[in-house]
Amino acid sequence: MEYSPLSIVITFFVFLLLHWLVKTYKQKSSHKLPPGPWRLPIIGNLHQLALAASLPDQALQKLVRKYGPLMHLQLGEISTLVVSSPKMAMEMMKTHDVHFVQRPQLLAPQFMVYGATDIAFAPYGDYWRQIRKICTLELLSAKRVQSFSHIRQDENKKLIQSIHSSAGSPIDLSGKLFSLLGTTVSRAAFGKENDDQDEFMSLVRKAITMTGGFEVDDMFPSLKPLHLLTRQKAKVEHVHQRADKILEDILRKHMEKRTRVKEGNGSEAEQEDLVDVLLRLKESGSLEVPMTMENIKAVIWNIFAAGTDTSASTLEWAMSEMMKNPKVKEKAQAELRQIFKGKEIIRETDLEELSYLKSVIKETLRLHPPSQLIPRECIISTNIDGYEIPIKTKVMINTWAIGRDPQYWSDADRFIPERFNDSSIDFKGNSFEYIPFGAGRRMCPGMTFGLASITLPLALLLYHFNWELPNKMKPEDLDMDEHFGMTVARKNKLFLIPTVYEAS
């Protein structure tokens, strides 16, 4: 018996409709969910995001104005809660933090980071607690970050020399910043520049664009035939295989080096890099949960991705905002040039006095948080603000909207670093109107590493050079379009013209 293509398609969509009706009935009959917009069969509220002509975080903010700071959406098969106010964020990340400590299990991390065994996406439990402890006490502690200061100093010196040689001509500042951070993190993680560094950084960027949480496969996880059409899994696996080959080679070389040192055949008593630390802990036998080589690769991948793309994007946005707001740029430069007064070498220890530069960084992270939609998942049925949030509900904490909430921020969409002058608000997740690094148990453990990677290059760029937009572009004409992913970067590269500052 033969079936026509039309009958197959009709059967498929009837199945989808029945599947949706069953899920919708169960939801409505058992839970009082927060308000949300009307939804269509099968796709739910996806059409509202698809037709918004803006990025997801911005489209969600527009819906929030109508439905409130705790809003329910049905994104395909996924029941989703959107949190868009400091008060509701505190409920999720402090009051009921342990109820929402899980990460949604997305397709890309499952393959990219070895079954989601990195610090960002590992399921909540003994393994995750151990990895977080290792990151906090060993890999990303203030002492460890400080031990890499000579690397940051060296790589930033090379950056300034490179820009100096191109002074007077437009340069791809975005590319230079990403290369700076890639080399810096590579030396900290692997002990030296990696031969495959350019390819590895390219793979990192591809992976980040695949981990935004709005892929079809993530929104319709049970519809396997649909996954064959999107080929998302194949794309992720291709990136993973190429990255794994590079990481495998790095681990092999580290293991060989450790063997030579143990046997007394090597003189490589170098400073421990991050791979060395993880291998030492693995071999120590002191870990409650044994660590595999794949676990090590997952953690290193995570640190590399966060340390390069997140920091480079923040520097991009800081320079973009100052080019858009030249008075801010001039004020930051005046502070630097007054304090250092013709000094040739500026070190990290010199930066404590730069109060306005610190405010510039804070304001950049308010308007451009590294992760604009922080993903969580409910693991214990919870009542919040009179609504019952069922287990497995995906939660998206919209840090982009929270940082622009007019109830907490005057002139919320304007870049005004002065708002942080004499302010007690910090990065530590205690002020829920300002959570660029998250808050609670899942707060980013790499905050200290990230801030150290941002502050020195920004200071040097402003101190050593004056900056102009190319083609006599006016500040108001500089585009600020975003490219959405796990990290939200500029959509278009930032090209600027540097001229060397000569102290009078």
Curated annotation (Swiss-Prot):
Its EC number is 1.14.-.-. Its cofactor is heme. Heme binds at C444. GO terms for molecular function: heme binding; iron ion binding; monooxygenase activity; oxidoreductase activity, acting on paired donors, with incorporation or reduction of molecular oxygen. Pfam families: p450. Transmembrane segments: none annotated. Keywords: Heme, Iron, Metal-binding, Monooxygenase, Oxidoreductase. Induction: By fungal elicitor. InterPro entries: CYP450_71D, Cyt_P450, Cyt_P450_CS, Cyt_P450_E_grp-I, Cyt_P450_sf. Belongs to the cytochrome P450 family. This is Cytochrome P450 71D8. It comes from Glycine max (Soybean).
